[in-house]
Amino acid sequence: MEVIEGLYYSKDHEWVKVEGDKAYIGITDYAQHSLGNIVYIELPEVGAELSAGDVLGVVESVKAASDVYTPVDGKVLEVNNAIVDDPSLVNNDPYGSWMALVELKDKSQLDNLMTAEEYKKFLDEE
């Protein structure tokens, strides 16, 4: 499973890429691999105010449907409609296929997430 350095990871297998006071959120390689071929993605509304643990969206595959949770508080600034039009993009490039861009409300929440090294250890225990 690919794990990218410089990102933050949740125990629910979401990744967070921070750029200034904004963060891109998507699902990890482990998550997309576990789901199998993704056939449908539901994203949040732009402008939605989300708290850590809220449902960010839904990913459905031929095997299962899974909620995706936001690991941080934030306001949705943008969503990636390309993955709605072609959900297989997430299977092919999970770290390039972000779901939402949010304005971070509290950067200290990042301390609750895992580094790439910590996430690799977490996966080894799964």
Curated annotation (Swiss-Prot):
Binds 1 lipoyl cofactor covalently. It comes from the Bacteria. Keywords: Lipoyl. The keyword Kinase does not apply. Its cofactor is (R)-lipoate. Residues 22-103 form the Lipoyl-binding domain. One of its GO terms (cellular component) is glycine cleavage complex. Pfam families: GCV_H. The modification N6-lipoyllysine is found at K63. InterPro entries: 2-oxoA_DH_lipoyl-BS (IPR003016), Biotin_lipoyl (IPR000089), GCV_H (IPR002930), GCV_H/Fam206 (IPR033753), GCV_H_sub (IPR017453), Single_hybrid_motif (IPR011053). GO terms for biological process: glycine decarboxylation via glycine cleavage system. The keyword Cytoplasm does not apply. Transmembrane segments: none annotated. The glycine cleavage system catalyzes the degradation of glycine. The H protein shuttles the methylamine group of glycine from the P protein to the T protein. Belongs to the GcvH family. The glycine cleavage system is composed of four proteins: P, T, L and H. This is Glycine cleavage system H protein. The lineage of its organism: Bacteria, Bacillati, Bacillota, Clostridia, Thermoanaerobacterales.
